[in-house]
Amino acid sequence: MQSSVYFDQTGSFASSSDNVVSSTTNTHNISPSHRSSLNLNTTSHPHEASGRGSASGELYLNDTNSPLAISSMLNTLALGSMPQDIASSNISNHDNNIKGSYSLKLSNVAKDITLRECYAIFALAEGVKSIELQKKNSSSSITSASLEDENDIFIIARFELLNLAINYAVILNSKNELFGPSFPNKTTVEIIDDTTKNLVSFPSSAIFNDTSRLNKSNSGMKRPSLLSQRSRFSFSDPFSNDSPLSQQQSQQQQQQPQQPQQHSTQKHSPQQCNQQQVNSSIPLSSQGQVIGLHSNHSHQDLSVESTIQTSDIGKSFLLRDNTEINEKIWGTSGIPSSINGYMSTPQPSTPTLEWGNTSASQHGSSFFLPSAASTAIAPTNSNTSANANASSNNGASNNGANQALSASSQQPMMQIGNTINTSLTSSNSLPPYGLMSSQSQHISNMVNTSDMNITPQKQNRFMQQPQPEHMYPVNQSNTPQKVPPARLSSSRNSHKNNSTTSLSSNITGSASISQADLSLLARIPPPANPADQNPPCNTLYVGNLPSDATEQELRQLFSGQEGFRRLSFRNKNTTSNGHSHGPMCFVEFDDVSFATRALAELYGRQLPRSTVSSKGGIRLSFSKNPLGVRGPNSRRGGSGNPNPNVNMLSSYNSNVGHIKN
């Protein structure tokens, strides 16, 4: 070998006192573990029998400052490894190389334990030399007096390596019921060095698991690159572990801002409930601020929902459930923020009335008090806000309203109020599928300009008032909807007069329209002719009828529908070319809700024929005018009585009589 030749040729260097370190000092400074790793075993050196050269080579190897020793130490270190890996590798190497006799003692065990059970406990342990079942008297040479337990029976397992004893001691110490539920006491685990008779401390199970998991994660991590910053022109390996780690970090960063937003939505929901209660208890004149708060919360909720729903972009709209589609269409989440702002923002032309106003009861001039020349004040009762407002004013508002109505029963201003109410309910800007009751149609049918003490110019002015945007129907309980005052008064006194029984039934029928009916209505395709897109009313137009259709089969088809009232059937006139366009049919129902359900259920129904029509089934749409009513001024009337004076007087007297009772 070159080293031996080198050592033999440099005798002067070996004999020099400046460069040679004594072997006693070197062996004293180097630990036994480092000796074995550096191959500094003096007894097994290959140059042991070579006289002077062997002595010089031995001294040179024992020198820690020699280049060979330094190179061997560097070879044992992993290049680019983390400091944790270096420390753990040194500790593991040190533990693995510490050999001796270590006893693992299990005390506080069951008294009836056998040696077979002791072997079963250590069946999965490695490096076990012997297992004994001893008593306290016979184990006095092994344990000290401080280690004695109350139980005089214990198990001793001897290990050769300390790390194996520590590993199994941690496993046994983590078991609370080592001997099953019949012996619930926790077993005491101790490690004793047989040479020194001292206890050897070992980590607890939680710390040991954390350190082992950390070591595994550190060992499995990719060696960090020397280049901390990569160039944007460099190619990135798609199979490296960096990309999934970066994706997970980005996902965690996206989820973290979403969590406080979800908490904010949960915090907003009780606030909205409280605001709804406040909205139902305050006067209508001061509801603008609360409505503004509703709009602000709606904007926040929509922004939160838009951020949460970004994860569902990849889902196809056709794969969604019908209920989810209906919620998107009819729920508040599907309404744009601008429309929601229009819904909740009160317009200046919105008619309002304060039920608890003392001036109305003191003056007694009229139930309707015009506040300006260009604006009309009419009673506005909604299902949630105004109705709760009228019932939550401690009875004072009800007394004021009753006095005002009794005073107005002998004055002509009640007629003006009915006219104003008619102008509001019969506006031409009604939304599609708006839900109005038959009572509003009945009241609008009562009103005629020739019977009212009001000029046509005033009525036209009332008719030209823009419809408030918040009268667009949304299927929610917190959205105010316009309901005529006669509905409220008649439903309140329905148990006192039999004439209001049908009215209350119509009210419950209109309020009982559910989201399922609206979902059925949403599936109906829009009419091909834009002229057929009429606002909802209680009358349906039946189109696309075959030329041989009869009134009997249509009556049989529609009479089974709930709320069916009557049917009008007639054939169209023959044109000059001799062609007939088929019969024409109108079907009237008790309420708009019944007409809506019938339209949703019977749209596209085929009449029983021997051959299937190529034009498809019947096409239903809302009629331009209710049955028996002509002209735009009195549309939406639900009664076929040609004399509106009788309807007006009878309804007027019945309403006043209900309030007096």
UniProtKB/Swiss-Prot annotation:
This is Protein WHI3. InterPro entries: Nucleotide-bd_a/b_plait_sf, RBD_domain_sf, RRM_dom. Residues 14-58, 237-280, 383-410, 469-508, 613-661 are annotated as: Disordered. GO terms for biological process: cell wall organization or biogenesis; invasive growth in response to glucose limitation; mRNA destabilization; positive regulation of cell size; positive regulation of cell-substrate adhesion; positive regulation of DNA-templated transcription; positive regulation of translation; positive regulation of translational elongation. CDD domains: RRM_scw1_like. One of its GO terms (cellular component) is cytoplasmic stress granule. Coiled coil: none annotated. Present with 5730 molecules/cell in log phase SD medium.
